[in-house]
Swiss-Prot record:
The protein's name in its UniProt record: Crossover junction endodeoxyribonuclease RuvC
Chief localization: cytoplasm
UniProt similarity note: Belongs to the RuvC family.
Active site positions: D7, E68, D141
Catalytic activity: Endonucleolytic cleavage at a junction such as a reciprocal single-stranded crossover between two homologous DNA duplexes (Holliday junction)
Record-level GO BP terms: DNA recombination; DNA repair
Keywords: Cytoplasm, DNA damage, DNA recombination, DNA repair, DNA-binding, Endonuclease, Hydrolase, Magnesium, Metal-binding, Nuclease
Oligomer status and interactors: Homodimer which binds Holliday junction (HJ) DNA. The HJ becomes 2-fold symmetrical on binding to RuvC with unstacked arms; it has a different conformation from HJ DNA in complex with RuvA. In the full resolvosome a probable DNA-RuvA(4)-RuvB(12)-RuvC(2) complex forms which resolves the HJ.
Length: 194
């Protein structure tokens, strides 16, 4: 199962892609940050985030998208941009018929470190260790996106409409979706040299 994690943000939106194999074996595929410039208008910033997220979903064809659940913060401008970016991630996934799960930061910390109150550096170190990376992913948005993907692999209970989507697909749509997933997996394995 390929899982794309999203740490939503208007200036920096973290994207992490992993593969969850048998026996909870997790493999790193990709990490990046989709950026928008604070010097352009809000609508164009949102478009940049949406286009970046759409490109990642088309490129990696995930089986699930795991997004950080947004909570109200003291800074309304920050929470508004974060909520808008989360909505764009949900929209991009829905347009591709990819199930979405929302996970709180506490859930992700608990899944990764065993401690829901873990510090950011502890989460980053565990993400690095779990995925056998040679160095910690940077910036923090990238590490958080990988943490959300790992969280979903280990604790998929946050899924929204998980099984319903398959029921609404025709047989031809299911075959097409399966073929697209297999093609993407072959390309990813080829890129990895497997």
């Amino acid at each position: 199962m390929i899982i794309l994690g999203v740490d939503p943000g208007l200036t920096r939106c973290g994207v992490g892609v992993i593969e969850a194999g048998e026996h909870r074996r997790l493999s790193f595929i990709h990490v990046d940050v989709v950026r928008s410039s604070p010097d352009i208008t809000q609508d164009l910033r949102l478009l940049a985030i949406y286009n970046g997220l759409s490109e990642k979903m088309d490129r990696f064809a995930p089986d699930a998208v795991s997004i950080e659940r947004v909570f109200a913060q003291s800074n309304r401008n920050t929470v508004l941009g974060t909520a808008q970016a989360a909505g764009l991630a949900m929209l991009a996934a829905a347009q591709r018929n990819i199930p979405v799960a929302l996970h709180t930061p506490t859930e992700a910390k608990l899944a990764i470190t065993g401690n829901g109150q873990a510090q950011k550096i502890q989460v980053e170190r565990m993400v690095t260790r779990i995925l056998n990376l040679t160095k910690m992913p940077t910036p923090a948005d990238a590490a958080d996106a990988l943490a959300l993907a790992i969280c979903h692999a280990l604790r998929p209970a946050g899924a929204l409409q998980g099984g319903e989507r398959e029921q609404h697909l025709t047989a031809a749509q299911r075959q097409w979706a399966e073929a697209a997933q297999n093609s993407t997996r072959r390309r990813i394995n080829h890129d990895r040299g497997m």
